[in-house]
Amino acid sequence: MIDLWPAIDLINSTSVRLTEGKYDSKEKMEKSVEDSIRFYSQFKCVKRIHIVDLIGAKAKEVKEFDYIRSLRKLTTKPIEVGGGIRSKQTIENYIHSGIDYCIVGTKGIQDIEWLTHMTHQFPNKLYLSVDAFGEKIKINGWKEDAKLNLFDYVAKIEHLPLGGVIYTDISKDGKLSGPNFDLTGRLALYTSLPVIASGGIRHQEDLFRLESLNVHAAIVGKAAHLDEFWEGLS
């Protein structure tokens, strides 16, 4: 099966989910962050845990560093972190605290020279998060239009030693309506970088379909909080 990366989105050290990235749609999850990590860690199909500092993404600087660092001891699974990462120092701080991978978004999209430098400083440790409505890339916590096309932009960074590209269709995020198979599949064919699908994943059938499209991994948010999603998985 495709690699499975369950997501934990943080606001004030609490696990929440948003719909279409809108902060006023915040929904608190029943399981605590700690319980979620312990639960996900029991599954072999879970290859890493994806954590996002939502306030950090909005504030353009990391807000949950100490709390996220405290989570490292709860699992032996690799952890990747995103949200507000815009400096070499922040990346170093996370890596030195035991976080395995960092996700960069807005800064990397707006400043390819910086992204190039960082990927060579931390080869295969950085993932680029590209969030879009269709092919139109959004930045700064999905609030602003980057005025960039998804495919045009990925062509410019394809040669970099990134771990991969995380593509989120914002219109699907948090809705449990299925991912954007068309665009995600086209992107996986278009680039030699590993493509990670995010947004809208509902059930295991979605995972199998993404796998058939040569997608490397799937980030699962709201569905991962539903017991039925995990039925039959080990």
UniProtKB/Swiss-Prot annotation:
KW Cytoplasm (keyword) present: yes
Nucleotide-binding found in the keyword field: no
Q: Name one GO molecular function term.
A: 1-(5-phosphoribosyl)-5-[(5-phosphoribosylamino)methylideneamino]imidazole-4-carboxamide isomerase activity
- UniProt KW keywords: Amino-acid biosynthesis, Cytoplasm, Histidine biosynthesis, Isomerase
Q: Which reaction does it catalyse?
A: 1-(5-phospho-beta-D-ribosyl)-5-[(5-phospho-beta-D-ribosylamino)methylideneamino]imidazole-4-carboxamide = 5-[(5-phospho-1-deoxy-D-ribulos-1-ylimino)methylamino]-1-(5-phospho-beta-D-ribosyl)imidazole-4-carboxamide
**Catalytic EC class:** isomerase
User: Domain of life of the organism in this record?
Assistant: Bacteria
State the active site.
9 (proton acceptor), 131 (proton donor)
**Entries under InterPro entries matching the protein:** Aldolase_TIM, His_biosynth, HisA_bact_arch, Isoase_HisA-like, Isoase_HisA-like_bact, RibuloseP-bd_barrel
Q: What is its main location?
A: cytoplasm
Name the EC number(s). Answer: 5.3.1.16
Q: Where in the cell is it found?
A: Cytoplasm
Biological process terms from the Gene Ontology for this record are: L-histidine biosynthetic process; L-tryptophan biosynthetic process
Question: Pfam families per the record?
Answer: His_biosynth
- Pathway of this protein? Amino-acid biosynthesis; L-histidine biosynthesis; L-histidine from 5-phospho-alpha-D-ribose 1-diphosphate: step 4/9
GO terms for cellular component: cytoplasm
The family annotation for this protein states: Belongs to the HisA/HisF family.
Q: Tell me the protein's name.
A: 1-(5-phosphoribosyl)-5-[(5-phosphoribosylamino)methylideneamino] imidazole-4-carboxamide isomerase
Q: Which organism is it from?
A: Staphylococcus epidermidis (strain ATCC 35984 / DSM 28319 / BCRC 17069 / CCUG 31568 / BM 3577 / RP62A)
